[in-house]
Swiss-Prot record:
It is found in: Plastid, Chloroplast; Cytoplasm, Perinuclear region. Autoacetylated. The record marks 261 as: May have an important role in the acetylation of the polyamine. Protein acetyltransferase with dual specificity triggering both N-alpha-acetylation (NTA), with a large spectrum of modified N-termini, including methionine, alanine, serine, threonine and to a lower extent valine as substrates, and epsilon-lysine acetylation (KA). This is GCN5-related N-acetyltransferase 6, chloroplastic. Expressed in green tissues and in roots. Its EC number is 2.3.1.255, 2.3.1.48. It holds the Pfam family Acetyltransf_1. Residues 1-111 form a transit peptide. It comes from the Eukaryota. Acetyl-CoA binds at residues 215-217, 223-228, 254-256, 261. It is an enzyme of class 2 (transferase). Residues 151-288 form the N-acetyltransferase domain.
């Protein structure tokens, strides 16, 4: 007797749809149907089984990250007690304070990451999973480690009389600013240094530098100077922390980003004889 079993599998995706997070279970194999073929030869019988895995769209289980309120209204700016903030046009750049702001920053990064791949299958699920992972990573980075400091900077819409907005509709841009220490032997971030048994960090004040990453702006809010002004605020924040050198990496094929950074005062670092860890990017330093 030959037996053929065909099973279906479910996959795990974590998705976000406005005010809901959806979790989908996977790796549970359910028999779909079975075909049995009898085959006899003399007094012997043989039995074989073949399992075929078929991917199907995931089922939905509703839940949300603990403590997040996606309908939470944006509090008035004075309630944050922020002295370090930068107003420009209809927006304000400052450090994120609320979990809902961290989440929206993570979602903007997910949108940016998958922007050129919108036709891929299950792209919305991938974006939502990316956003959840980035949300947790932002909170972890902002707690600091080894004396290093990281801030999630956001651009939010200014308050308007008689208009109430939720937090997730107020945040229109984001970036990360890290205050780091050069590794022993480094003269710029990402430089290849001679391999050592133990890698040490020189925590002298003069060996600190600022590093900007994860800059993105909501598609609906672009071409309003948000990216440039967030960069200016980040540079000024680094200087207020006693850091003069501020760096950013940009992909060599991303001419739009290169133009943005150079317009804001960044210039490509001529590493020359030095080796960089990443040959696909340029290192830029703020010089103005």
């Amino acid at each position: 007797m030959s037996t053929i079993s065909i099973h279906r599998t479910e996959t795990l995706r974590i998705t976000h749809a406005r005010s809901r997070i959806f979790r989908q279970r996977y790796r549970r194999t359910i028999p779909l149907w079975k075909l049995t073929i009898n085959s006899r030869s003399s007094d012997t019988s043989k039995k074989e089984e073949l399992s075929v895995q078929i991917s199907i769209p995931p089922q939905v289980d509703q839940s949300r990250p603990e403590g997040l309120r996606f309908d939470r209204l944006q509090p008035p700016e004075p309630e944050f007690g922020h002295e370090d903030r930068f107003e420009f046009g209809k927006f304000v750049a400052r450090e994120a304070m609320l979990d809902e702001e961290y989440w929206t920053a993570a979602w903007l990064r997910a949108e940016s990451h998958w922007e050129d791949r919108s036709n891929e299958r299950y792209v919305d699920n991938y974006k939502r999973k990316f956003a959840e992972q980035e949300f947790n990573a932002i909170k972890r980075r902002c707690k600091g480690m080894q004396g290093q400091k990281c801030s999630c900077i956001v651009a939010v819409k200014k308050e308007e009389k008689h208009i109430k907005r939720s937090v997730i509709k107020s945040v229109v841009g984001t970036l990360d600013l890290s205050i780091r220490y050069f590794l022993q032997g480094e003269t710029f971030p990402g430089e290849k240094v001679k391999s050592q048994l133990f890698c040490s960090i020189n925590q002298e004040g003069s060996n600190r530098y600022g590093y900007i990453a994860n800059l993105c702006v909501a598609k609906s809010a672009r071409r309003q100077g948000i990216a440039c002004n967030m960069l200016r605020f980040a540079v000024e924040s680094a200087r207020l922390s006693g850091v003069e050198q501020v760096y950013v990496h940009v992909h060599k094929n991303n001419s739009v980003a290169q133009e943005l950074y150079q317009k804001t005062g960044f210039k490509i670092v001529e590493t020359g004889k030095f080796e960089s860890l990443d040959d696909d990017t340029y290192l830029l330093q703020y010089t103005s």
